[in-house]
Amino acid sequence: MAKSGRDKIKLESTAGTGHFYTTTKNKRTTPEKMAIMKFDPKVRKHVEYKETKIK
């Protein structure tokens, strides 16, 4: 079987609420850490989410 080129990652809110999204990313095309503006329902605003590893 072929080895998967995608890693599971956790995008955690920088607002300090503990809210997170999970997604996958291609580790060859995007080796740097992701940072995306997404909606945080706990503060009801768009905030930056940064990539962390899933434990």
UniProtKB/Swiss-Prot annotation:
Compositionally biased tracts (Basic and acidic residues): 1-11
Chain segments carrying region Disordered: 1-28
A biological process term (GO) from this entry: translation
Gene3D superfamilies from the UniProt entry: Ribosomal protein L33
Record bears the keyword Ribosomal protein: yes
Keywords: Ribonucleoprotein, Ribosomal protein
One Pfam family matching this protein: Ribosomal_L33
Keyword Ribosomal protein in annotation: yes
Listed PROSITE patterns: RIBOSOMAL_L33
InterPro entries linked to this entry: Ribosomal_bL33 (IPR001705), Ribosomal_bL33_CS (IPR018264), Ribosomal_bL33_sf (IPR038584), Ribosomal_zn-bd (IPR011332)
Residue ranges, compositional bias (Polar residues): 14-24
An example molecular function term from Gene Ontology annotations: structural constituent of ribosome
GO CC terms of this entry: cytosolic large ribosomal subunit
Family label: Belongs to the bacterial ribosomal protein bL33 family.
Matches recorded under NCBIfam families: PRK00595.1 (NF001860), rpmG_bact (TIGR01023)
PANTHER family associated with the record: 54S RIBOSOMAL PROTEIN L39, MITOCHONDRIAL (PTHR15238), LARGE RIBOSOMAL SUBUNIT PROTEIN BL33M (PTHR15238:SF1)
Name of the protein described by the UniProt record: Large ribosomal subunit protein bL33
Species for this entry: Janthinobacterium sp. (strain Marseille) (Minibacterium massiliensis)
